[in-house]
Every structure is written in C-alpha cells, then in structure tokens.
Amino acid sequence: MLKQIFNYERMKIIMANVYDKIVGDAHVVCSSSLLKGTEVGHILSVKCHKDLDNGSIITRGAWVEAQVFDSADYAAGKKPYLVLTTPIGYNSDRKYYQEEKYFYNAAGEIARAYELYVDDIFEVSDDAITALATAPVVGNYVEIENGLYKEAAAAPKSGIALKIIEKVNYTNGVSYRLHVESLGM
C-alpha cells in the first residue's frame, strides 16, 4: 500500500500566501479624544442609511424602534453627530482582520453616534480629510462633504465649524485633531 506523504511546511507556505494577499478597502479611523458625549452627553444608536466610516458626521433621522433612529446626511442647521462605533472584528484569526482601518459601519447596521458640543475635540485619520494641497494644514478648518471632511482656509459660513488644531504622527499613519468651534445651529 502506498502512503501519501503530506508536506505540512509546504502547505503552510501556500496557505499563508493565500491569506496574506487579502486586501480590504481602508476606512477612516477615529478617536474620541475629548468628547462631552463620552461622559454626560447623548450617545444614539443609529441605523446607517449608507456605509459610514467612523468619524463621519451625520444628523439624526426618524425614530425606528427601541432607542434606534435612522441616520441621515448632515446639512447645515441640523444637529451634528459623530459616528464612532467600537471597532470589533469577529474574524480575528489574521492580523489584517484586526486592523482598525478595515472597520466601517455598513448600511442597515446599527452604529453608535455621539452628540457633538462646542469645545469637543476628536481625532480622525488623514484619509478622512480632503486637503487643499498635499496635506491638511493645522489652523485651517474643515467643511462636511458626504459625511467626511474637506479642508477650507476659513471657517464655513454655515453649519458646524471644525478647526484642525493638531497633526498627530503615529507609527502606522497620521491623524488630525479637530476642535468643534461652533455647531452652526
């Protein structure tokens, strides 16, 4: 009888190559540096009306059910909320699945949204901001565009006013701290 010899080392290399080539779309990473909502403000459960990155600015829509509201695109004059759901990965057998940049809130899912207040400070990864030039400039402002941020030299005339107050360098990327100067309501 012929015995089949199984080469575990070769199989391990083949499998590692397959899994190591998994690539996902990168998303915004957000941190609640100094949000009033983490202590005494409102934290809403919102049903995502579209795919939303953590760090997106939305407004509250209609009541859905048991403490859940619909989310809606932010518009000047509406109350702004910061989408920031704890990034829990259910498939954590590979390092790639554990990287926070691959986490997002899918359309139809329930996400966490923090009510924003004047003087709140939060942090978003650099890919959240569409820069005027090569990189966002500390001291400039951002406007909300499709839920994320577009750099502007001056504060917006209407809507929430967010100022870029600090660039933060990390080993794996760059983030910017944003200061809520006005809610624009």
Regions found by a protein language model. Give the residues of each.
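Surface-exposed, low-hydrophobicity beta-strand/loop segments enriched in small/polar/acidic residues
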Residues: L2, N7-M185
